[in-house]
Curated annotation (Swiss-Prot):
GO terms for cellular component: host cell plasma membrane; membrane; viral envelope; virion membrane. Gene3D superfamilies: 3.90.20.10, 3.90.209.20. The gene is HA. This is Hemagglutinin. InterPro entries: Capsid_hemagglutn, Hemagglutn_HA1_a/b_dom_sf, Hemagglutn_influenz_A, Hemagglutn_influenz_A/B. The lineage of its organism: Viruses, Riboviria, Orthornavirae, Negarnaviricota, Polyploviricotina. Glycans are attached at N7, N8, N22, N38, N165, N285, N483. SUPFAM superfamilies: Influenza hemagglutinin (stalk), Viral protein domain. Palmitoylated. Disulfide bonds join C14-C466, C52-C277, C64-C76, C97-C139, C281-C305, C473-C477. It comes from Influenza A virus (strain A/Duck/Hokkaido/21/1982 H3N8). It comes from the Viruses.
Amino acid sequence: QDYSENNNSTATLCLGHHAVPNGTIVKTITDDQIEVTNATELVQSSSTGKICNNPHRILDGRDCTLIDALLGDPHCDVFQDETWDLYVERSSAFSNCYPYDVSDYASLRSLVASSGTLEFLTEGFTWTGVTQNGGSNACKRGPASGFFSRLNWLTKSGSTYPVLNVTMPNNDNFDKLYVWGVHHPSTNQEQTDLYVQASGRVTVSTRRSQQTIIPNIGSRPWVRGQSGRISIYWTIVKPGDVLVINSNGNLIAPRGYFKMRTGKSSIMRSDAPIDTCISECVTPNGSIPNDKPFQNVNKITYGACLKYVKQSTLKLATGMRNVPEKQTRGLFGAIAGFIENGWEGMIDGWYGFRHQNSEGTGQAADLKSTQAAIDQINGKLNRVIEKKNEKFHQIEKEFSEVEGRIQDLEKYVEDTKIDLWSYNAELLVALENQHTIDLTDSEMNKLFEKTRRQLRENAEDMGNGCFKIYHKCDNACIESIRNGTYDHDIYRDEALNNRFQIKGVELKSGYKNWILWISFAISCFLLCVVLLGFIMWAYQRGNIRCNICI
């Protein structure tokens, strides 16, 4: 007879935590795969597929690179004096003017991009004895031959090209960027036809720097009908400094300067469409939400962005260890506590009670312990997000071929940083997951110990997270245990009396079992004695003979 279930003078009270049929696998310090009831993804692994134009000012470069817009390529005239937070260069961008190359292209591109403006101011350079505003069929502006709008191609006047010596002081309180060039003719005949001298020379200097360029005459691959080239150079003139230009031929002169600004603007190569929306973080793949601490979309970012990590997923446990409920004998047919398994269907709390008494069965959540666990887990999640969601952007890194070793070093440094961030992120999440599981287990144990202290000798720990209560405990009594108002003194005498009676019955049942076992053993012994006696009697009568052969 099972007194814990059938005797109206007793009751069973179990403590447990909620469970779900299919939990989420997370990593901890001690276990790579542990199932929890709930987890939050910390890695943003997808973008919106479009670049949001708010709050950042996005300038769509369309078919113009930033350098083409800077020089004034005819098809980029719409970008004159433009400003931006982020200049988006498209893969479809192309040059449509005289073929050129840029000395230290990446540095100039980065400098102009960070300035965030193409604001240009014309200055009154005096070029005496030469013809200005040269053009080329390779650079048409409308039906006529043209040239870069920010540059002035100087050629001979009549049959002379005098030595040019021009100075331009910087009397303002900001840096000025001057862009100039040197023309490399394809033949000696072209050289003399344009500049008279068989070999020209261009020297541009300030108090801090000097560059002297001698043209390289020779044929090159044809581009837009030209085998000559223009080399573009640039010089920054600080406030109080002076720009000096000296040349006897081949000079592509500046028309003025670009006003340099110190800012956090940038440039990005992307083919993602630009749309009207709001996002703090932009990647070449598109804008991404900013509500997680890590992202795996792209290393290159602009704005208040998430840290890039290698992992495509990092799950932070926001629930307890999941132990699905065993349903072999029904919900209460096999009432059991948290030591055996969790409870499914607890929708109003994480921890709770199940009871079985003379009035039937029931279940209720313990809101206090549930709220304590939730508050600590939410605080942990917020701390992780705040700790890792630093506002920064990672610009593109470019280097020319001669800077290959620098590029390799830069790539190594960036890869190492990403490796460290990825390792730190994984370690942080594993540590926090371990703490969360320990924390939720601790809250369960606290509730169990609190209940044990209330019941004292009035109940017995059944070893599975349940208590056998040795007195009649109706629903009001069960509720007093749950809310902490249970008075064990009221039920002590009844509990002691019932305990002795139940233990006595269990003891008698135990004696009966022992007597049965002893009787069975004696019967077996007597049967063996009778069988042995029969064998001895038959042997003496000669009915049984035993031969031993060696």
